[in-house]
Amino acid sequence: MGSEQSAEAESRPGDLNASVTPSPAKHRAKMDDIVVVAQGSQASRNVSNDPDVIKLQEIPTFQPLLKGLLSGQTSPTNAKLEKLDSQQVLQLCLRYQDHLHQCAEAVAFDQNALVKRIKEMDLSVETLFCFMQERQKRYAKYAEQIQKVNEMSAILRRIQMGIDQTVPLMERLNSMLPEAERLEPFSMKPERERH
């Protein structure tokens, strides 16, 4: 009985002196710890006929430009870098700088020519715009005069219609008068054209 009490005292969780060691059954099993006892129901696949494996084998292999800078290597090898001649690299950079300078000069020359041409075109367009404005003002005056002529023409047409309605009435009235009191026939033509 005393030994049971001492065993209980050791296994109490509130006791500070009790050493806690997890049992191996409570550990999570890893993939390496699992042992397959029975063969699965799947038929064994032939890896050489797998389309994904065939596609992976068709991918060509690539080598990095600087082999010393592979991700797996901790210290890059400077063997390839040491073979580059610094004078030749400097000459290459200077030639490239000269090429860029020439390109910049060509672009600046073309840009200045374009700016000059744009200014010339602006001046031409402004001159043409002023000329067209003057012309438009002139044509606006002509259009105003034509409008007045159209209004006068409409008035004259109304007068002509009134005369055309009045002349037959005058002739009828004139024919009712005695012979001695009759007027001469009415005519719109000037007197010299009548003779």
Curated annotation (Swiss-Prot):
It comes from the Eukaryota. GO terms for cellular component: axon; BORC complex; cytoplasmic side of lysosomal membrane; lysosome; membrane; plasma membrane; plus-end kinesin complex. It is a lipid-anchor. One of its GO terms (biological process) is regulation of endosome size. Keywords: Lipoprotein, Lysosome, Membrane, Myristate, Phosphoprotein. Myristoylation at Gly-2 mediates attachment to lysosome membranes. Disulfide bonds: none annotated. InterPro entries: TBORCS5. The keyword Membrane applies. A lipid is attached at G2 (N-myristoyl glycine). It is found in: Lysosome membrane. Residues 1-31 are annotated as: Disordered. The keyword Membrane applies. The modification Phosphoserine is found at S71, S75. It holds the Pfam family LOH1CR12. Belongs to the BORCS5 family. Component of the BLOC-one-related complex (BORC) which is composed of BLOC1S1, BLOC1S2, BORCS5, BORCS6, BORCS7, BORCS8, KXD1 and SNAPIN. Interacts with ARL8B, KIF5A, KLC1 and PLEKHM2; links the lysosomal BORC complex to the microtubule plus-end-directed kinesin motor. As part of the BORC complex may play a role in lysosomes movement and localization at the cell periphery. Associated with the cytosolic face of lysosomes, the BORC complex may recruit ARL8B and couple lysosomes to microtubule plus-end-directed kinesin motor. Thereby, it may indirectly play a role in cell spreading and motility. This is BLOC-1-related complex subunit 5. It comes from Mus musculus. The gene is Borcs5.
